[in-house]
C-alpha cells in the first residue's frame, strides 16, 4: 500500500472500508543540494522557516525564497530549538547560534562547551546533552553562545548514556538508551534543572530523531534491556 491509507466506512456500507489516496504534494522550492538535515519554524517571531541542507543553513520566507545564513559541520540530523530571539543548532558535536535581530550566525566557541547532540529550550535556557555521556548542560540565561563551566548535571539513576533531551510542558524529558527521566526548572544556580522525584521509567529511546510531540504528548521509538522497536506515547510520567 504505497501512498494509501485505510478509511473505515460507517455501518451499512457495501464494505467495511477502503483505501484512500494520500493528499498530493506540490513542489514549492529546492533548498541547497541536500540532504535535508533539519527543519524549523520560528516559535514566536515572524513566519520564516529554517532548514539545514547538506552543510548549509538557510532561512525561507513566505514566498519560499531561501537565504543562505551560514555553514555547519557534520552529516547527520540536526537538532534545533529557538528562544524567540536566537536559534540553536546542535550538529553533534558542534553547535551554532543564529540571532535574528542582528542577522548573525556564529559557531559556539566558548571554551567550556563540550558538544551538543540534541537541544531544547526551557525558561530562558538552551539545554543540551553532551555526546556519548550522561551529562546535560544549559547555556547562560538568554544567551546560547555562552556556557558556565559549572552549569551541568548528570542523569545518574541508571548507567545508560543520554541520547536526547526534549522540552514538554515546561519540563525536560531526558531520554537515555534504556531509561527516561523528567527534570524541571528548580531555579538553582549555576545549573537550574533537577530530576522530578518518581518521574522515571525503564524505557529509553532507540532513535533520538524519532521523538515527536503531538497532542500534548511525546511519541518515541523505545528501547530497554529486553529489546527495542515499540513506539511509545507518554501518559503522565
Per-range role (PLM):
Residues 1-66, 116-188:
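N-terminal beta-propeller domains
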Residues 28-34, 69-74, 108-113, 153-157, ...:
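Surface loop/turn motifs at the tips and blade-to-blade linkers of beta-strand repeat domains
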Residues 58, 96-97, 181, 232:
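WD40 beta-propeller blade core
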Residues 60-89:
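A broadly used, surface-exposed interaction patch
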Residues 79-111, 127-128:
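Hydrophobic or amphipathic alpha-helical targeting/insertion segments
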Residues 86-88, 119, 161-237:
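Beta-sheet-dominated scaffold domains
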Residues 94, 133-134, 225-228:
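Short glycine/acidic-enriched loop and turn motifs that connect beta-strands
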Residues 100-112, 144-149, 189-196:
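A short alpha->loop->secondary-structure connector
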Amino acid at each position: 500500500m504505497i501512498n494509501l491509507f485505510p478509511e473505515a466506512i460507517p455501518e451499512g456500507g457495501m464494505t467495511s472500508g477502503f483505501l484512500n489516496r494520500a493528499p498530493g504534494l506540490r513542489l514549492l522550492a529546492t533548498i541547497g543540494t541536500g540532504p535535508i538535515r533539519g527543519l524549523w519554524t520560528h516559535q514566536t517571531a515572524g513566519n520564516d522557516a529554517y532548514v539545514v541542507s547538506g552543510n548549509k543553513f538557510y532561512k525561507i520566507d513566505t514566498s519560499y525564497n531561501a537565504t543562505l545564513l551560514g555553514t555547519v559541520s557534520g552529516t547527520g540530523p540536526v537538532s534545533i530549538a529557538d528562544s524567540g530571539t536566537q536559534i540553536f543548532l546542535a550538529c553533534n558535536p558542534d553547535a551554532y547560534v543564529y540571532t535574528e535581530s542582528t542577522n548573525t550566525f556564529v559557531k559556539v566557541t566558548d571554551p567550556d562547551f563540550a558538544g551538543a547532540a540534541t537541544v531544547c529550550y526551557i525558561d530562558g535556557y538552551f539545554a543540551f546533552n553532551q555526546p556519548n555521556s550522561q551529562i546535560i548542560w544549559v547555556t547562560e540565561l538568554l544567551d546560547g553562545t555562552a556556557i558556565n563551566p559549572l552549569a551541568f548535571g548528570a542523569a545518574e539513576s541508571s548507567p545508560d548514556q543520554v541520547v536526547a533531551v526534549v522540552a514538554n510542558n515546561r519540563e525536560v524529558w531526558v531520554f537515555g538508551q534504556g531509561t527516561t527521566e523528567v527534570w524541571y526548572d528548580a531555579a538553582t544556580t549555576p545549573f537550574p534543572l533537577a530530576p522530578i522525584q518518581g518521574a522515571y521509567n525503564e524505557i529509553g529511546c532507540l532513535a533520538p530523531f524519532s521523538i515527536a510531540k503531538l497532542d500534548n504528548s511525546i511519541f518515541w521509538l523505545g528501547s530497554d534491556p529486553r529489546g527495542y522497536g515499540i513506539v511509545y506515547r507518554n501518559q503522565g510520567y
